[in-house]
Amino acid sequence: MYLMAVGREVLVIVCVLVLAGHAQKTCDISRPDSTSLTVNCSRRDVRDVPNDWPKETEFIEKDGYVLITFFNNSITDVTQLAGVPGSRVAISFQANKIVDIVDDAFQNIPTLVYLDLSYNQISGDVLRSEIFQGPYENGVYGCIALETLNIGYNKIHSLDRYLFQHTPNLTRLYLNNNPIEILDHVTLLALSTATNLEVLDLASTEIESIPLDAFKSLSNLQQIDLSGNGFLTVPESLSFVGKTLKYLTFNDNPIAELNDDSFVGLTNLIELEVGENENLEEVKRSTFTPLKSLKVLHLCHNANLRYISHNAFRGLKDKWTLKEVYLDDNHLSELSKDLMPWNKLEILGMSGNKWLCNCELYNIVLKQGAGTKFKSGDEPFCAAPMKMSGEYVTNVTLSYCPTFDTTFAKTTRPSRFKPKHILWTILGVSMVVCVGMLIGLFVNTFKKYYKKKFIQ
């Protein structure tokens, strides 16, 4: 009996020690280098924000970098966090169940530069300026150093107008995948205070329009993502940031055409991505003319894009800046040899289309050297004529060169007629009407004369 009792006591002690060991292992500590420290608290079923950090954080240098992750836990409320040494602190609460954040939550970490609150259940009412208040000194709340804020994949409809009052250094804001629907007045006021913003992600926010002056205060904006929304045209409001905007992503919108009004004012745009737009059928004349600094164009995965005007790059060919053009996975069959100076490209993508291998394509691929711009293993194939179906377009030869097929051109569209043709048509119709009137007048006069003579 004595031995059994002793055995039970030993077992209890061992269990307590094991549990204590696990309790101390809630977060793992790693030191990538002498100036960096990572506190990994991810996937531990953590339900509450800890009151303090592991002791190892006390030894980080003042100019060190600290990363703290709570990815994929069960935290519902973000309470006030303990202070963390280091000149740059990043914290991730991604993929929790957060529904509330207390005031002064990050007050003890004024060097917080990166905060990820994505994939939670945060509403717009939860996001208040008070949660980003810095240290309280001389009766005034200071600011925190926040540069990147990710609040994507939440339940945000609107932003508090003072939300960014204490984050003057904010340069990257991710609002994607929230049910915003309308950029209301208070949301626009909030954005207007983030004057140092360089990156703005509004993808999949269910918006269909942007007020004209929405971005007029964002004089440093360089990158914006408007994908996955309900835009029928490219928002004209982008012209307000045309001098600074360098990257525009405009995928998955119900736009039917691109034209000379689509990119007005975007003179400094470097990279443009327009893809996965199922309704896009046509790229019209002078569409890309305003893009005088464009280097990379992604015009891909538009299932119904059949036509690109030979003047789509009108005015740019003499001062050509484009280095990479991707036209993959559209519904194109033909391109004009004059569309662009193909030999000036560094990379060209054309795969996944239904190419008619004719004289125009021969000129583009072989004579102008476009065939040397394809990435290895990404060479496009011929779809027609039947004789060349399945062949690489680089195998097109002069021995088989069918007539250029212009069935893609809409010949009945009024815009296709030249002014002189319209003028001659009007004159012709007018002459027919005049002749008809003269004949009618002659017949009536003859009838009156004949009737008068018959009565006499």
Language-model-derived ranges and their functions:
Residues 2-456:
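Extracellular leucine-rich repeat
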